[in-house]
Every structure is written in structure tokens, then in C-alpha cells.
Amino acid sequence: MTSQRTRERLIQRLYDEGLSNPQVLEVIRRTPRHLFVDEALAHRAYEDTALPIGHNQTISQPYMVARMSELLLAAGPLDKVLEIGTGSGYQTAVLSQLVERVFSVERIKVLQDRAKERLQELNLRNVVFRWGDGWEGWPALAPYNGIIVTAVATDIPQALLDQLAPGGRLVIPVGAGEVQQLMLIIREEQGFARHVLGAVRFVPLLNGPLA
């Protein structure tokens, strides 16, 4: 079930659901999602659904990975993107093929180590990893043209707003429990423009690094 045919079916479904950026769709097509899930779930890798990866975390639904990537790229190419929540490394791998450099923060060390190995196997070398608290971002390397958060925050972390470059775009799920909204925040000259894009479902963004 990891054949090219199953990948093509996934891409067609994403297109049918309104995703249209050809660059994003091509990267989703060629990125082997089955390498980012447990072997027992590999036969489900190209379903449009989130799957468990251990440690109460999930690999995001392909639709959401593609949509968040499209939102980041909507204003043009990006050279420096911060990802909060490496997780399986799948979103990281997709981003690394769409932007010049990715800086990815993960609080669960074992997940980060696995993600590093997978990206090395795929020869994706433009990603730098940090083990730490995603709420803090990565201030030492700021600012970023784009920031993507792959877990739901109860509110928008001020640290991430501070690390966004002028004109930069932050894509983040915000809320708690069953009430979560995907938001796009753009840094403008006079402040931040905030756009609510619809209901989503993500695991929570937690504080502090975890061994």
C-alpha cells in the first residue's frame, strides 16, 4: 500500500479538497510518508488521516500538512522557516523541500532523534534541530520569514510573534480541547493581522523539554 498509485490517490484527494499549489502537491507526492510512521501502520501511510507516533503525539493529516505549507508560501518563496514541533519529521521534510532553511524545535528528544535519522536517510540537509520548549521559539536565530506550529496553543505565544520578521507569516492552531481554530498571523508595519481559517484538531503544545 505504499505504491505510487496510493500516493497519486492521496494527491488527487488533496486537489479535490481545494489544495492547488503545484509545488506543495509535488513535494507531498514524492515524500515517502510511510517512512515516518511505525512499520505496523505503513499500510495506512497514504490515507488522509493523522496517525499515532508514540508519546501521545501524531503525524499530521496530509491535508493539514499541505494546507499549512500553502499558507506559509502564499506570499512567495521563503528562505528561513521556524517549525515548532518536529514530531515524526514529516512536516519538516516537506518544508525542507519548499524553503531554503528550516529550524525545527521539539521537546521530546526521542522523537527528534528519529526525525533526524529519517531526514538524513532522505538526504535533506537544510534542517537544523533544537531540543527545547516550543513556546520559546528559537530567539537566537530570529527573525524568521515563516513560523509553523504543529500543535495547538491555548493562546498565541508572544515569543513567536516577536521572532517573526516584517511581512512574515505565522500559521498556528489556537484553542483547547474540542474548540480549536487554525490561524494565520501576518506581521505588518502597524502590528499583526490575524485571520481565523476554520476548525482543526491538534495535540496540545506543551511547555518544557522532555527527555
Curated annotation (Swiss-Prot):
Pfam family, one: PCMT
SUPFAM superfamilies: S-adenosyl-L-methionine-dependent methyltransferases
Record's subcellular location: Cytoplasm
Keyword Transferase carried by entry: yes
This protein's GO CC annotations: cytoplasm
EC identifiers of the protein: 2.1.1.77
Keywords: Cytoplasm, Methyltransferase, S-adenosyl-L-methionine, Transferase
Enzyme class per UniProt: transferase
Active site: 60
Record GO biological process: methylation; protein modification process; protein repair
InterPro entries: PCMT, SAM-dependent_MTases_sf
GO molecular function, one term: protein-L-isoaspartate (D-aspartate) O-methyltransferase activity
CDD domains referenced in this protein's UniProt entry, alphabetically: AdoMet_MTases
Reactions performed catalytically: [protein]-L-isoaspartate + S-adenosyl-L-methionine = [protein]-L-isoaspartate alpha-methyl ester + S-adenosyl-L-homocysteine
Protein's job: Catalyzes the methyl esterification of L-isoaspartyl residues in peptides and proteins that result from spontaneous decomposition of normal L-aspartyl and L-asparaginyl residues. It plays a role in the repair and/or degradation of damaged proteins.
Family: Belongs to the methyltransferase superfamily. L-isoaspartyl/D-aspartyl protein methyltransferase family.
PANTHER family named in the record: PROTEIN-L-ISOASPARTATE O-METHYLTRANSFERASE, PROTEIN-L-ISOASPARTATE(D-ASPARTATE) O-METHYLTRANSFERASE
Protein name (Swiss-Prot/TrEMBL): Protein-L-isoaspartate O-methyltransferase
Source organism of this protein record: Pseudomonas fluorescens (strain ATCC BAA-477 / NRRL B-23932 / Pf-5)
